[in-house]
UniProtKB/Swiss-Prot annotation:
Domain GATase cobBQ-type: 252-444
PROSITE patterns from the UniProt entry: GATASE_COBBQ
The UniProt record lists the keyword Ion transport: no
Protein name (database record): Probable cobyric acid synthase
Residues that span the membrane, as ranges: none
UniProt keyword annotation of Flavoprotein present: no
Origin species: Methanococcus aeolicus (strain ATCC BAA-1280 / DSM 17508 / OCM 812 / Nankai-3)
Annotated pathway: Cofactor biosynthesis; adenosylcobalamin biosynthesis
Record GO terms (molecular function): ABC-type vitamin B12 transporter activity; catalytic activity
Length: 493
């Protein structure tokens, strides 16, 4: 039987995701088998779990923090926004329906049934389950339909922690207001408060601690100091709205990423963050980098239409002709071909549209979605690399180019044992693949970066700086939590 803990917040972006990851690492380091859990997540960033089903990237990252293999039961309900208030619903890893909010509400009892199934599975197979809420746990206009917060804590008899971000201001009012607005049956589940992102001397908060404890009869478990040095993955495309440039600002290598309107799985790019400067460019902007990445997208035909409208397709062709490295991932790969053929309009209203034309290939839409963890041998110049990735795509690609990867497992271009396309002759350096997570394979990533470094006369890299950086940061954050938050009572079974 597992002990259930839930982290809920006074608002979105209060620190729930990273706090769950940190608690998971603390417990894993103590030798416990730990599962992260989020009953319902809304995100365009997803990964493939062990069962070849989709879960949100946040729960995948939390599974890394937990030192366990990712499972579809860590995120039984995943909502992938498609625009116009419509989302694709993924249930225990598999596509279920594409519906609007009112239709979703009508299916609430079905989703609760699947959530309970996953909770039962976790209860039988783990020592601890550390659950994450969604947004604010007390949106009083939505409480009746909320299946992501304290209703789940009640179902699992979890001890709940309420976290609030003091960097936004009004932390004590947020804590007090949230607790007082909760129904009594859920209020009593809150066992402690955590104040996140505090700058300065925490002693100035002592009077506030005392007052909030007197008012609510709930203790403050601790305060997590703000740290600019911590580097943990972003969860969703919302994080891109205010992000233009990130990564290693001192690197001589610049990676440009086209900011697609329906960008998905942009966490593919994170792997470059230690060794390159990463810059997102809009359709109207010029390409200034050494490497151009066309990322994943929910709708390749829409992005292709927009690229034509703003002449981005021409800019990409010109960049490639000058020897620039162009890499397309999933939907971005599809746009690199001659044609995107959507006679059934499964991608939307646009239908069939010409691609950029970098590859001699065509992609046909309307097939069942491929959801699979994949691996194979990637061949580039004189190097062969064993690479792992995951596929989340509709579309079958017929390519006359040399394939990039000989598959051991996966769907690839058209379920024929090969994935991707590569053209590195006649001054071209064009790469496309359906593998999300391709850059997590450090030998391939370093190969791409080292091409630029060598051309500019810089020292080449040989280490896996990205993976090492994640482990270093999650362990550091776990240590910060242990040093500043009293969780022993929460951990007691």
């Amino acid at each position: 039987m597992a002990k259930f803990i839930m982290v809920v917040g006074t608002s979105s972006n209060s620190g729930k995701t990273v706090l769950v990851a940190g608690i998971c690492r603390i417990l894993a380091n103590k030798g416990y088998k730990v599962a992260p859990f989020k009953s319902q997540n809304m995100s365009l960033n997803s990964r493939v779990a062990n069962e070849d089903g989709e879960i949100a990237v946040a729960q995948y990252t939390q599974s890394l923090a937990s030192k366990v293999e990712p499972s579809i039961h860590f995120n039984p309900i995943l909502l992938k926004p498609m625009g116009n208030f419509v989302s694709q619903v993924i249930v225990q890893g598999a596509p279920y329906k594409t519906i609007n909010y009112n239709e979703y509400r009508e299916d609430k009892e079905y989703y609760l049934t699947k959530i309970k199934e996953s909770l039962e599975y976790l209860n039988k197979n783990y020592d601890f389950v550390v659950m994450e809420g969604a947004g604010s746990c007390c949106e009083i206009n939505l409480l009746g339909d909320d299946i992501a917060n304290l209703r789940i804590a009640e179902l699992s008899n979890a001890d709940a922690i309420l976290v609030s971000d003091i960097d936004r201001g009004g932390v004590f009012a947020s804590l007090y207001g949230t607790v007082e607005l909760l129904p009594q049956k859920w209020k009593k589940l809150i066992k402690g408060f955590v104040i996140n992102k505090f700058r300065g001397n925490a002693e100035v908060l002592i009077d506030g601690y005392k007052k909030i404890e007197e008012l609510t009869n709930i203790p403050v478990l601790g305060t997590i100091p703000y740290s600019e040095e911590l580097e943990l993955p972003e969860e969703d495309s919302q994080a891109l709205q205010n992000k233009k440039v990130f990564g290693n600002i001192n690197s001589p290598v610049e990676v440009n990423v086209v900011r697609f309107s329906k960008i998905s799985n942009f966490t593919d790019i994170d792997a470059f963050s230690k060794d390159a400067l990463i810059k997102f460019i809009d359709f109207k902007e010029d390409i200034t980098g050494d490497i151009l990445i066309l990322p994943g997208t929910r709708c390749s035909t829409v992005e292709m239409d927009l690229m034509k409208k703003y002449k981005m397709d021409k800019k990409i062709k010109d960049f490639a002709k000058k020897g620039g490295i162009v890499i397309g991932i999933c939907g971005g790969y599809q746009t690199m071909g001659k044609m995107l053929i959507d006679d059934t309009h499964s991608e939307g209203d646009i239908g069939t549209i010409e691609g950029i034309g970098l590859f001699d290939m065509e992609t046909y839409f309307g097939n069942k979605k491929a959801i699979v963890n994949s691996n194979g041998i990637l061949s580039i110049k004189d190097d062969d690399f064993l690479v792992n990735g995951y596929e989340l795509h509709e579309g079958i690609t017929h390519s006359n180019e040399k394939p990039l990867i000989k598959l051991n497992k996966g769907f690839g271009n058209k379920n024929d044992g090969y994935d991707g396309s590569i053209n590195i002759k006649d001054g071209n350096y064009l790469i496309g693949t359906y593998f999300h997570g391709i850059f997590d394979n450090y030998e391939f990533r370093n190969h791409i970066i080292n091409m630029v470094l060598a051309e500019k006369g810089h020292k080449l890299i040989t280490e896996d700086n990205y993976k090492d950086n994640f482990e270093k940061n999650i362990n550091k954050f776990a240590e910060i939590i242990e040093n500043n938050v009293n969780l022993e009572k929460i951990f007691k079974k």
